[in-house]
Design a protein with these regions (language model features):
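General N-terminal targeting signals
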Residues: 63-65, 111, 159, 217
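Active-site neighborhood of glycoside hydrolase catalytic domains
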Residues: 74-96, 103-211
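N-terminal catalytic cores of secreted or lumenal carbohydrate-active enzymes
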Residues: 1-95, 99, 116-118, 122, ...
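Short, intrinsically disordered, charge-balanced linker/junction segments flanking boundaries
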Residues: 213-219
Length: 219
């Protein structure tokens, strides 16, 4: 996890992302990824999950909560393309993305940006998918949802409603939270049968300390 808020698109109003930069990642994150690649005997695939757009793209001008302004949908789609290109230039191939980490929100404890199933599907169908296709990056995997399993049905019903809505989705991402008391087998089966030829991937799992009680822990 990052120790601070930062964006690759820090310049407000840079809708063409002419100043897009991953320099912040070059000291620690990229060397860590390369070290892991060198240590792995079998190799692994990398996918990325944005937690929020830069505040200037959002309706609440904040790192936390709020929604992507509709006028910045094209810019945000370009962001994914630029990110993949920038990492490739560093010798790291990105396999794919989730569209948004925890699009239903996270209690405003961390960076976040809210999408409804309909909003995310519109973004993927009309902006992200066509942008990657136009840039020759159609092999990049796009995973929708990316939150807890209990809400799968509502999301996959929208994502995989028809051929048009599902065209650019390569699968569904899920988190393990809440699964300590129920692993939601019916929801998992429903999502699988809704789109049996698409990925259903566990995208995040961590044991996070209670917020803000972690500040009382001995470090």
């Amino acid at each position: 996890f990052s120790l601070s808020n930062y964006s690759y698109t820090a310049i407000e109003g840079d809708t063409e992302l002419e100043h897009f930069s991953i320099d912040f990642d070059k000291d620690d994150l990229i060397p860590m990824i390369k070290a892991a690649q060198e240590a792995s005997e079998d190799g692994f695939k990398l996918f990325a999950s944005p937690w929020t757009a830069a505040p200037w793209m959002k309706d609440n001008n904040s790192w936390v909560g709020g929604k992507l302004k509709p006028e910045h949908y094209s810019t945000w789609a370009l962001f994914f393309s630029k990110y993949a290109d920038a990492y490739k230039a560093e010798g790291i191939d990105i396999w794919g993305f989730t569209v948004e980490n925890e699009p239903m929100g996270n209690g405003n404890n961390w960076e976040s940006m809210v999408f409804s199933p309909e909003e995310m599907t519109l973004f993927v169908q009309k902006y992200l998918g066509p942008t990657l296709e136009a840039k020759g990056q159609e092999d990049l995997v796009i995973l929708g949802f990316d939150q807890n399993r209990g809400d799968l049905k509502e999301w996959v019903d929208v994502m995989y409603k028809d051929k048009a809505s599902s065209k650019y989705y390569d699968g569904t991402a899920i988190h393990w939270y809440e699964s300590t008391y129920d692993y939601f087998p019916k929801e998992l089966q429903y999502a699988h049968h809704k789109a049996p030829n698409k990925h259903l991937i566990q995208a995040e799992a961590c044991v996070d300390s209670e917020v803000p009680a972690w500040k009382d822990d001995a470090w």
